[in-house]
């Protein structure tokens, strides 16, 4: 029931855009898994974080059309199962006209959406009454988040891209880490930010939340990262030099923000001899589009006083107090 002709938008495009949602019961007992019902929602769903079941109600965030279409907007719809029919019982429509959703997070009675065209509006929604959801607050800042993580009930920890405003649009630039205070949902505030590299810098965590490793017991944030420098990201030019490929580990707290603890180098597999060149940079171009961001390191695990970083070719073990020194390395190609 979903009608989408292509990725882009052009003037005069009028196709309807709908998504069908199917509900199933899942269980281990015989015949415990089965079809329960369906419903239709306007627009398209970004990813799994755009759907959430809470106290018997399904909340869904969608975008209709695509930026910069004047018809582009987003919607939060709340569904209730009524005898096999998923019916909309509450809705907030026409959110952020001309923009599209870049990240979503539902947390109990609240919802958070980041949209983007040239700035990053963070919207906070009150979903306590499923039949009367409402917008509580909004914050507009440069850039956008592609993943939002609940640091605690009143703070969001996010990763995304910084952006340089060009008037009618914006260039995405370096990788952006942010902490938002949403204690007062009517007045969300950016309390800390960290920009890594310039345009062309990338992380697997930008497009895959499994690469985003926030370890709350130690207030540590471990992120796969490709760092590019040089060039002029504000004018759309990609970085001219890759200065780091590997895992970056930050101390991340609400009180103090981000402090780089250290780095675990994983030189890119395309590098000659798997080492840095004579200028101290990694031999690989700096170019990526935000929707297919990736990095050499794919995952990390923090265990006791050690961090394990995993790429497609190796696993490294490093002590959290001496990240630049490898304790052990295991090749996955031999």
Give the predicted meaning of each segment.
Residues 1-334:
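Beta-sheet-rich non-transmembrane sensory/scaffold domains
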């Amino acid at each position: 029931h979903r009608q989408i002709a292509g990725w882009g938008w052009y003037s005069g495009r009028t196709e309807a855009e709908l998504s069908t949602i199917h509900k199933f019961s899942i269980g281990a007992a015989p015949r415990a898994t089965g079809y329960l019902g369906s419903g239709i929602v306007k627009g398209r769903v970004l990813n799994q974080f755009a759907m959430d079941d809470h106290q018997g109600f399904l909340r869904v965030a969608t975008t209709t059309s695509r930026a910069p279409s004047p018809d582009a907007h987003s919607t939060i719809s709340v569904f209730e199962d009524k005898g096999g029919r998923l019916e909309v019982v509450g809705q907030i429509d026409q959110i952020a006209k001309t923009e599209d959703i870049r990240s979503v997070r539902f947390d109990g009675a609240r919802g958070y959406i980041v949209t983007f065209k040239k700035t990053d509006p963070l919207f906070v929604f009150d979903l306590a009454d499923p039949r009367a959801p409402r917008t509580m607050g909004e914050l507009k800042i440069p850039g956008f988040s592609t993943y939002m993580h609940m640091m605690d009930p009143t703070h969001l920890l996010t990763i995304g891209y910084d952006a340089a405003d060009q008037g009618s649009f914006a260039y995405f630039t370096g990788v952006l880490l942010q902490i938002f205070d949403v204690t007062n949902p009517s007045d969300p505030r950016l309390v800390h930010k960290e920009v890594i590299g310039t345009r062309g810098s990338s992380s697997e965590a930008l497009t895959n939340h499994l690469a985003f490793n926030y370890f709350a017991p130690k207030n540590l944030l471990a992120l796969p990262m490709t760092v590019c420098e040089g060039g002029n990201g504000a004018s759309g030019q990609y970085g001219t030099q890759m200065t780091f490929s590997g895992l970056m580990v930050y101390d991340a707290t609400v009180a103090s923000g981000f402090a780089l603890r250290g780095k675990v180098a994983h030189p890119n597999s395309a590098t000659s001899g798997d080492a840095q060149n004579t200028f101290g940079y990694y031999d690989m171009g700096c170019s990526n589009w935000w929707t297919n961001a990736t990095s050499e390191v794919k995952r990390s695990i923090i265990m006791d006083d050690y961090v394990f970083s995993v790429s497609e070719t190796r696993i490294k073990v490093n002590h959290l107090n001496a990240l630049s020194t490898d304790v052990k390395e295991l090749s996955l190609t031999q």
